[in-house]
């Protein structure tokens, strides 16, 4: 395999046949990379969208730049999933403190304010409880474009790992149950401690999402189990850490 990375000490270099060290905006290096490979994929979702779109013009890219764009923005992601008739937390776009005040009034407390892009493992977010001011929460996330999500009281957190091929064939793995400490995934247990019917519903939801995106590759879909309901938290356009 051939690796492209901006870091000179990427661990993948140790097992790759070749590698290029260059920035994601170095389009000459990207074009040279694209000419040397048959298919390009990415292993995390913070590759710039214009980088993915550029590669797509010069080689086969999977997953597509459109799928990446949807997964990179929490508003786009939630809107897309809700449009499929799949449950997500109540949400609202927040572009300023006044927006946040209005969103809190509509969605209520507790709720969670998250940056629209780049946050992970609890970073780039602020929990809003009764004593939290909108100004404090807005400052905590760096006053970046954001999403306010209603807080979900859940019984379990699960994920579904699904793969889809060029021909549209979908394979879905057994559902793991995930446990986090300080927002970091610590354990994934397979099978999850859920009913067979709930597991089948989760797998069906994952198949719906990956098919609707016309996705090619492996995807992780994180979900909350709350009573009899399954609520999608987010999608990861890559091999998921669970």
Residue spans of the language-model regions?
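Conserved metal-phosphate-binding beta-hairpin within the catalytic cores
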Residues: 214-242
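ATP-binding N-terminal substructure of ATP-dependent carboxylate-amine bond-forming enzymes
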Residues: 1-79, 83, 98
């Amino acid at each position: 395999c051939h690796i492209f990375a901006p870091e000179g000490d990427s661990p993948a270099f140790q097992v790759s046949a070749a590698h290029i060290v260059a920035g994601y905006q170095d389009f000459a290096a990207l074009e040279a990379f694209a000419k040397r490979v048959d298919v390009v994929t990415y292993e995390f979702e913070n590759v710039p969208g214009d980088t993915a779109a550029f590669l797509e013009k010069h080689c086969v890219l999977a997953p597509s730049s459109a799928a990446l764009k949807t997964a990179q923005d929490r508003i786009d992601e939630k809107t897309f999933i809700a449009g499929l008739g799949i449950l997500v937390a109540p949400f609202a776009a927040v572009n300023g403190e006044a927006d946040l005040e209005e969103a809190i009034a509509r969605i209520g407390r507790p709720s969670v304010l998250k940056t629209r892009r780049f946050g992970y493992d609890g970073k780039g977010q602020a929990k809003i409880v009764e004593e939290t001011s909108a100004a404090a929460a807005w400052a905590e996330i760096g006053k970046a474009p954001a999403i306010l999500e209603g807080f979900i009281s859940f019984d379990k957190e699960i994920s579904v790992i699904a793969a889809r091929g060029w021909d549209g064939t979908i394979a879905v793995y057994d559902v793991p149950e995930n446990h986090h400490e300080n927002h970091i995934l610590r354990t994934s247990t397979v099978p999850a401690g859920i009913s067979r019917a709930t597991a089948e519903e989760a797998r069906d939801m994952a198949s719906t999402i990956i098919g609707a995106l016309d996705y090619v590759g492996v995807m992780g879909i994180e979900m909350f189990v709350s009573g009899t309901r399954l609520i999608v938290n987010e999608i990861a356009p890559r091999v998921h850490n669970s």
